Amino acid sequence: AAHGERVGVLDLTRGEAASTGSAEIREQEAARSAEVMGLAVRKNAGLRDSGLMNDDASRGVVVGLIRELRPRVIVTHCREGRHPDHRVAAQLAYDASFLSALKNYDAPGDAHRPEKVVHCLLFREDAPPPSFVIDITDHFETKMAAVACFESQFSGKTAAGEVFGGNARSLEDQIRAQCAHHGSRIRRDYGEPFWTRETVALESLGSDGVSTF
């Protein structure tokens, strides 16, 4: 959003099955984080929390929202994850992106296909090597402020979502450490890794911006 792109978030569930907080609290937290990130839109698909399915009904809902929002790029979960919803979300987003372009697919709106589906890799211990790492140094504190909005999920925690526990470091410290590690891979302070099915093109051999030495 800081670079002038129109950015939105589609939450697939309301978090009603979570151990902490409630769907109503999560909705308030999502609204605060949207303001922090400068989102153009934030919507909720209202699918079942902790029971997310990549079935015809769910694909129809997501296709309708893709056709409404008409994104150029979709960023979703890693294809592997410890939360079943996260694994399903990755494939659901991919399948819905394809189906959305089918003119006669039974869902609201006019056909539309995003150009890319990109998968987040942060915190996955079994992730493939990233296709690329984005320099988030200038926006890292905004990222942390957006995460902090979700107090019911993350406040006082050392593990949440895809972040495994096992040490005394706060969730904030673990996020900083992970992003600093990936930043070092591109010779920057902080970075975020992503993976795509397709090959990433470069203009020339030296255009990736990362020095060998």
Where are the regions a protein language model picked out?
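Active-site rim/loop-helix segments in enzyme catalytic domains that contact anionic ligands
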Residues: A1-L69, S207-D208
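Metal-dependent de-N-acetylase/amidase catalytic core
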Residues: D55-F213
